[in-house]
A protein has these predicted regions:
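Hydrophobic transmembrane alpha-helices of multi-pass small-molecule transporters
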Residues: 1-80, 86, 182-323, 428-453
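Helix-loop interface residues and adjacent transmembrane-helix termini in multi-pass membrane transporters
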Residues: 20-24, 80, 95-96, 135-137, ...
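Membrane-embedded alpha-helical segments and adjacent helix-loop junctions characteristic
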Residues: 50-141, 298-380
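Membrane-interface alpha-helices at helix entry/exit sites of multi-pass transporters
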Residues: 99-104, 134-147, 176-187, 334-335, ...
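Alpha-helical transmembrane segments and, especially, the helix-loop junctions at the ends
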Residues: 113-124, 140-178, 196-200, 349-365, ...
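Juxtamembrane/interfacial segments at transmembrane-helix boundaries in multi-pass membrane proteins
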Residues: 169-182, 317, 325-329
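Hydrophobic alpha-helical transmembrane segments
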Residues: 183-197, 263, 338-353, 384, ...
Length: 453
């Protein structure tokens, strides 16, 4: 094994082992590991590995960080207005079962996530669940974990729901409607929704001990409707701008949006809310509270993870794994295709549980194209590229649900719980995520094969 690959594997493995074992220190561990990659890359200890500070800064997804900060600020004003409490009251008045309430909130988060970034979805829906759990005097952990996982799951339902979907659409030449039906066959939307429906039974099973029925005698009065309007405008603006391509995905001469557009949108509406609050209350107290409540723990952790994954990708480790897949095309028989398809799906689940699925998907897409071509030529089968493309998306998108650090939405959800005084361990998180993910992935795995082979 080359020295660079060995170094990358060792540092990467130690980093994630420590983050699992020392959960309170995850940001420090992530930043330290990121610094090691940058230091080694800057010193030129490996001739083929150049990874300086500027390279690391480019790997950080500032769009995501700005979006989290801006949305958290607006959400704080939203919570202070009393609207989440009122929404909780309305839900309780209509659905008296705790289990059904969690299911409805999870499905609601999933629906929004099909059109809005997963992290933003969690930050918008979670406060309602937290307010509800406070009313019922129960732990918000199951509800928030289910909301986070559900938002990750349904992000793959549409072209605009997740970055991995955008990458796939470019590689497979798909447009917005192709995620619903393509060439007369069901697209990823229906595969994802089928997985979501199956996962409902997992939520009901995990919540089976919550048998209480709840009733309310009065409803909360909302103090200010402006934060609610700003949050709705945030969602609407994110949806509308999602139809505008980024520079890398735009055609020559086509108008495109900047890479940090979503982050700027979220920060803009928070700024409007902050100005409105100062004018209305004639003091800075609420704005100071909003800035203080931004989850800097999550922001630092994500920044560190982005740099780490950038280093792993720069070292060529992910690409080497992809090359290995491309080299085992086999005979091109139906069984060979099935084995390759199975390998791509479940390998994607495994790796996306520990690393960000965006660089992984970007690396694997050209590999999938090569593998499809090799299999078709070897066995003479007419293999549709969407078989492996959609299989990759099923594995890469849903796999991030398994671990707390496998997806930004999970990290954001756990950050909100931490703010409420609830530290969620890896074991507790995975008691929900593993059965949920397996149910959704197996459903998608079977459906994609039946539809496209």
């Amino acid at each position: 094994m080359p020295a660079l690959s060995a170094f990358t594997i060792v540092v990467f493995a130690i980093t994630y082992i420590l983050m699992f074992a020392l959960q309170k220190y995850r940001p420090y561990i992530a930043v330290t590991s990121a610094a090691i990659f940058v230091l080694v890359g800057s010193m030129g200890l490996f001739s083929e590995f150049r990874y300086g500070i500027l390279d690391a800064l480019k790997e950080i997804d500032w769009n995501v960080l700005m979006m989290i900060a801006g949305t958290m600020g607006t959400v704080y004003l939203f919570i202070e207005s009393g609207m989440p409490k009122l929404m909780s009251d309305v839900l309780v008045s209509r659905l008296h079962s705790v289990k059904l309430l969690v299911v409805v909130l999870s499905l609601f988060a999933g629906i929004i996530s099909a059109f809005v970034d997963n992290v933003a979805t969690v930050l918008m829906v979670a406060p309602v669940a937290i307010a509800l759990c406070k009313d019922l005097k129960i732990s918000p952990v199951p509800a928030i974990v289910c909301i986070s996982i559900s938002s990750n799951l349904q992000g793959a339902a549409t072209l605009v729901g997740d970055t991995t979907s955008i990458l796939l659409a470019k590689a497979a030449n798909l447009d917005f409607t192709d995620f619903f039906f393509v060439e007369g066959r069901p697209g990823m939307f229906w595969v994802t929704e089928a997985g979501a429906l199956v996962s409902i039974f997992i939520i009901l099973f995990k919540m089976r001990k919550e048998t209480a029925s709840v009733y309310l005698n009065q409803r909360t009065v909302v103090k200010d409707m402006v934060p609610t309007a700003l949050l709705l405008l945030t969602v609407i603006t994110l949806i509308l701008t999602s139809f505008i391509p980024y520079k890398d995905h735009a055609m020559p001469g086509e108008f495109y949006k900047p890479d940090i557009s979503n982050g700027l949108i979220c920060l803009f509406y928070f700024a409007v809310g902050a100005i409105w609050t100062v004018v209305k209350n004639k003091n800075w107290d609420s704005v100071k509270g909003a800035i203080k409540e931004i989850d800097y723990y999550t922001l630092v952790l994500l920044a560190g993870l982005f740099v780490i994954i950038g280093g792993v990708t720069q070292a060529g480790l992910i690409e080497k794994i992809g090359d290995l897949i491309a080299g085992i095309g086999g005979s091109g028989s139906r069984m060979s295709v099935f084995l390759i398809y199975t390998l791509i799906v479940w390998m994607s689940v495994f790796f996306s549980a520990f690393i960000d699925n965006i660089p992984y998907t970007a690396t694997m897409l050209p590999v999938v194209a090569v593998v499809t071509n090799q299999l078709s030529q070897a066995g003479g089968l007419d293999i549709h590229p969407n078989l492996l493309y959609f299989g990759l998306l099923v594995g890469a998108t849903l796999g991030g649900n398994i671990t707390p650090i496998g997806a930004s939405a999970n990290i954001a959800g756990l950050g909100l719980l931490r703010k409420e005084g609830h530290e969620v361990g890896t074991k507790e998180f995975m008691s929900y995520s593993v059965p949920f993910t397996l149910a959704a992935v197996i459903t998608g795995y079977v459906l994609v094969w039946l539809i496209w082979m």
